């Protein structure tokens, strides 16, 4: 049974309190939640109202949650407040780790739990808007979302196959089922009295329009939180991203903030101001910067790249230090193109962005092989070059855009440290010193579940690198090849003994560039692209 919408009077969109709005959510509804980490486009007031209502009344019950992008703060925000037994029975997320209380329910087998690649998930919502049954893609082949492996299922109570193997013209693809949502929680900055909405204070658009269309076209209720409402037909048409006829309920929250923390709107990350070139932004010389510096060596002039969250995200700052940041374009899967990537939970809140696409279109570009290079952080690597990030140490993190990005990028640069768990290093006199070794080996013999398939990458002719603070590897048909080591480390003691398998040692094994280890600009000149 579809939810009942409140009526419009004289064309005006109903304006309700958040508490009144969530009363329209019936039991068993499928709720799709917009938002990214750090409070980006998160309808926090609506989420809080729903969580509070369930605490007080134990209704609505047995909701299904769809969350394409990881929203939250890696603690108690995002969709974590909805992690109440009986409120949620089923979840399909692109990323799980930003709202860990939902992940906890999945790990404890208390909810049915699926993970689609983030880009695939937003594309299935677009398919749901068009009343298409799903999408067909080769994104995810050879990884844990492949039905020949785990099929995107995250725990033992998740049984139904949402992903199927299909064949067209003798080519294998994955079919991802589209799930049509009944309720949407979306957010904008301003709307008029008919629901037409603009995003002037926001840092991106994500897939707000796709979600609204999917819910509207399937007879559901689109609930939109905004900071203010204005007279009808007074918003500039080129600024309107959500047409009013898609919106069923508006919740006005004058205290709505751009990001978590309640700070005033940052006009640099909203794209209104441009940071002057003289503004100093730099990283201290540590293992994080060391990896970012070495990763920059894989960039070429004119390239279009992607940078992911984690240790890889310092590459933009390093390029700015070296004066070559304008010689290539870095993108983020959530939509930003160009500029300086932010770090931490609000990843994607870029400064000096050149353009912002909707997230679904950004992933179309990625899936089609548009990226020349990508920089992604890794959790674990095995002897076949497979990489794991979506689940480790028993914790469900989810893939985010990792699978979408790494599947077709012409060059893939994985960034991380060789070990984890209290690793401490220092860089002195142009050398790397391991002060305290990490407790956990990250290069293991076999991955239990695969987020990136080395085999598929080789079949597609992709160039794969693994960059750590003390060693650089490349992927070939016979496995990982060690091609560089840091000055100051011992090959056997500091590298080979800290891996569960022995890589092929390149006969041309060399030291990593000495400039990486000096606390001054490297004088790096970006190479021309090969033709």
Predicted feature residues:
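Short glycine-rich phosphate-binding loop at a beta-alpha junction
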Residues: 31-33, 304-308
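Short, well-ordered beta-to-alpha junction loops that form the rim of enzyme active sites
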Residues: 36, 189, 309-311
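Glycine-rich phosphate/ribose-binding loops and adjacent secondary-structure elements
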Residues: 22, 61, 281-284, 293-300, ...
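Beta-solenoid repeat scaffold
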Residues: 50-63, 328
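Conserved phosphate- and dinucleotide-binding cores of soluble alpha/beta proteins
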Residues: 2-5, 9-23, 38-54, 66, ...
């Amino acid at each position: 049974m579809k939810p009942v919408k409140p009526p419009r009077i004289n064309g005006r969109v109903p304006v309700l309190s958040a508490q009144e709005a969530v009363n329209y959510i019936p039991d068993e509804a499928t709720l799709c939640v917009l938002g990214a980490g750090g409070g980006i486009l998160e309808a926090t007031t609506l989420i809080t109202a729903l969580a509070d209502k369930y605490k007080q009344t134990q209704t609505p019950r047995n909701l299904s949650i769809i969350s394409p992008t990881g929203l939250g703060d890696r603690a108690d925000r995002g969709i974590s407040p909805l992690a109440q037994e009986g409120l949620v029975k089923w979840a399909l997320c692109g990323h799980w780790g930003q709202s860990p209380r939902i992940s906890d329910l999945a790990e404890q087998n208390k909810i049915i739990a699926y993970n689609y690649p983030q880009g695939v998930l937003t594309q299935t919502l677009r398919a749901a808007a068009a009343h298409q049954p799903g999408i067909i893609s080769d994104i995810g082949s050879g990884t844990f979302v492949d039905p020949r492996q785990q099929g995107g299922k995250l725990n033992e109570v998740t049984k139904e196959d949402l992903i199927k193997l299909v064949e067209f013209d003798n080519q294998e693809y994955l079919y991802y089922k589209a799930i049509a949502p009944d309720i949407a929680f979306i957010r904008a900055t301003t709307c008029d009295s008919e629901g037409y909405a603009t995003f002037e204070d926001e840092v991106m658009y994500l897939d707000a329009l796709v979600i609204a269309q999917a819910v509207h076209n399937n007879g559901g209720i689109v609930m939109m939180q905004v900071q203010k409402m204005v007279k009808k037909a007074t918003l500039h048409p080129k600024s309107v991203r959500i047409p009013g006829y898609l919106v069923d309920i508006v919740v006005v929250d004058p205290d709505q903030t751009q990001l978590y923390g309640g700070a005033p709107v940052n006009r640099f990350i909203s794209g209104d101001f441009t940071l002057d070139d003289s503004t100093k932004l730099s990283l201290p010389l540590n293992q994080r910067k060391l990896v970012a510096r070495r990763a920059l060596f894989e960039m070429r002039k004119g390239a279009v790249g992607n940078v992911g969250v984690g240790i890889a995200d310092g590459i933009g700052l390093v390029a700015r230090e070296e004066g070559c940041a304008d010689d290539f374009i870095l993108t983020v899967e959530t939509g930003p193109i160009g500029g300086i990537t932010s770090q931490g939970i609000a990843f994607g809140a870029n400064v000096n962005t050149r353009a912002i696409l909707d997230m679904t279109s950004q992933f179309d570009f990625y899936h089609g092989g548009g990226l020349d290079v990508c920089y992604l952080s890794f959790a674990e690597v095995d002897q076949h070059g497979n990489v794991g990030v979506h689940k480790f140490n028993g914790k469900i993190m989810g893939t985010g855009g990792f699978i979408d990005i790494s599947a077709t990028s012409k060059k893939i640069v994985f960034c991380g440290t060789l070990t984890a768990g209290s690793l401490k290093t220092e860089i002195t006199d142009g050398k790397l010193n391991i002060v305290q070794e990490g407790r956990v080996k990250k290069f293991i013999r076999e991955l239990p579940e695969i987020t990136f398939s080395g085999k598929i990458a080789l079949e597609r002719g992709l160039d794969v690198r693994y960059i750590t603070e003390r060693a650089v590897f490349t992927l070939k048909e016979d496995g990982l090849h060690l091609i560089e080591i840091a000055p100051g480390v011992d090959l056997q003691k500091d590298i080979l003994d800290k891996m569960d398998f022995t890589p092929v040692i390149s006969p041309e094994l060399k030291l990593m560039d000495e400039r990486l280890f000096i606390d001054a600009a490297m004088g790096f000149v970006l190479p021309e692209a090969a033709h």
